[in-house]
Amino acid sequence: PSIVDLCVHQASKVCADYEVTLLNPSNLNEYISLPEISSDIPASNKADLIRLMLIEQYGGIWMDASIFLTEDLEWITSKLDRHESFLFYSDECTKDTRRPISENWFIAAPIGSDFIKNWKEEFLSCITSKKPKSFYNDMEDRDYHLQGLTKPDYLLCYISAIVVLNRKKYNII
């Protein structure tokens, strides 16, 4: 779509020192090997796994192609040597800002981030289970942890992040 072309062009212009890589089904296997995943898993959940696998393996920045940048990302990347990850959180879903609901349309992390590794492993456990959509249904204190998260069976990756963040304290900005 033309909006994506505009956003990618802008990212390349604003972040001229960065390599912008556009992924598609024909070039994805040049970067990662996806595990066997049921054909019942929605494309959005496969995309969630892809972004986590790429960030874990290569570090750097994942941005959805429809993000329009107005400035370079140095204000984020300059902090990554001291932090596990940079994430945005959902104002709509977060009821307690001490426990923000992490978004995944923009993720920045150094290579080897424990948080990203653990998030990916948790999410992979969910989507390779026999019933991914109900994987977190029996989660202890589920309503407390999910706060205002709508469509939990669609936003499984968000729940995986919640689970990981509840297990251990990470240095995330």
Region spans (language model):
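Glycosyltransferase-associated regions of secretory-pathway enzymes
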Residues: 1-48, 65-173
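Small-residue hinge/turn detector
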Residues: 48-60
